[in-house]
Amino acid sequence: MPRHHQRGSAASGGSQRQLRVAETVRHAVADILSQGSAHDPDLEGHIITVPEVRMSPDLKLATIYIMPLGGRDTDVVLAALERNKKFLRGEVARRVNLKFAPDIRFRVDERFDEAERIEKLLRTPAVQRDLNSDLEES
């Protein structure tokens, strides 16, 4: 492998180290939120899933994708996480062995909404008709 070959790419989601650290951070944040360690009333009433974390190449920024169960109150949950960002960053630093504690940025994971939209499209009469005609032809 040539020395100038870059490891990882945007298509693969980053280097192996980025992926490994992102998964470790994801587990840490999911544990913190499930244990209710933040002690915020806006967070305590919600079950929050953390489906993905993306790390910057220098591992100094973690973009954490979240989704409250049922997809409700995303704005309230996002605001509560922003208020507790300093605490969460400290907890992540304590649980994940890195040279620097990554800065944390929260985003709502919209893949669930997109999957639901596609599922609804697949159930429309026009698509069902096309699918059935394809089955009859084969």
UniProtKB/Swiss-Prot annotation:
Keyword Cytoplasm tagged: yes
GO terms for MF: ribosomal small subunit binding
Chief site of localization: cytoplasm
PROSITE patterns cross-referenced by the UniProt entry: RBFA
Compartment list: Cytoplasm
GO cellular component, one term: cytosol
UniProt keyword terms in alphabetical order: Cytoplasm, Ribosome biogenesis
InterPro entries in UniProt: KH_dom-like_a/b, RbfA, RbfA_dom_sf, Ribosome-bd_factorA_CS
Pfam name, any one: RBFA
One biological process term in Gene Ontology: maturation of SSU-rRNA
UniProt keyword annotation of Cytoplasm present: yes
Subunit structure: Monomer. Binds 30S ribosomal subunits, but not 50S ribosomal subunits or 70S ribosomes.
PANTHER family in alphabetical order: RIBOSOME-BINDING FACTOR A, CHLOROPLASTIC-RELATED
Protein purpose: One of several proteins that assist in the late maturation steps of the functional core of the 30S ribosomal subunit. Associates with free 30S ribosomal subunits (but not with 30S subunits that are part of 70S ribosomes or polysomes). Required for efficient processing of 16S rRNA. May interact with the 5'-terminal helix region of 16S rRNA.
Family assignment from sequence similarity: Belongs to the RbfA family.
Stated name of the protein: Ribosome-binding factor A
Lineage: Bacteria, Pseudomonadati, Pseudomonadota, Alphaproteobacteria, Hyphomicrobiales
Gene giving rise to this polypeptide: rbfA
